[in-house]
């Protein structure tokens, strides 16, 4: 599937993990991407409350969620789980969603920001920032969640950061 460069807008990017969610946002023009403090996961309800605050305060117009595809761009079990979780969050937040290939994003973020071995969550948010930069360059366009926001089989596999 060929992705098209989306029109810039205020976005929130999520690098999902079992213990933390790395967060990054961009301005409405898509010029500045900033890592945000990571979210320490507790429960879906608490995650949602924190994300709702970010979405309201930043006037977010859509979510970008990274999926850990394998080296060939094929979905992993974890990617399928994160796709469902991202869709659940997008539905609850009433926001459109874009799914992007996050293969190697943590490695690339560790290299770029010298965060090898980080356990504070900064690496997760740095990876979320790379995912958002990738989305701003390559897409795909946001989709309403009820449209089954481009199933994992249609995520642009050329883009692993």
UniProtKB/Swiss-Prot annotation:
Under the heading Pfam families, the entry gives:
RuvX
One MF term in the entry's GO annotations: nuclease activity
- For this protein, the Enzyme Commission number is 3.1.-.-
State the UniProt keywords alphabetically: Cytoplasm, Hydrolase, Nuclease, Ribosome biogenesis
GO CC annotation: cytosol
Q: Where mainly located?
A: cytoplasm
User: Known InterPro entries for this protein?
Assistant: RNaseH-like_sf, YqgF, YqgF/RNaseH-like_dom, YqgF/RNaseH-like_dom_sf
Q: What's any GO biological process attached to this entry?
A: rRNA 5'-end processing
Q: Superkingdom of the source?
A: Bacteria
What Gene3D superfamilies does the annotation carry?
YqgF/RNase H-like domain
**Subcellular locations according to the entry:** Cytoplasm
Instruction: Give the function comment from the record.
Output: Could be a nuclease involved in processing of the 5'-end of pre-16S rRNA.
Similarity annotation: Belongs to the YqgF nuclease family.
**Database matches in HAMAP family:** Nuclease_YqgF
Its protein name is Putative pre-16S rRNA nuclease
**What organism does this protein naturally occur in?**
Prochlorococcus marinus (strain MIT 9313)
Please name the taxonomic classification of the source.
Bacteria, Bacillati, Cyanobacteriota, Cyanophyceae, Synechococcales
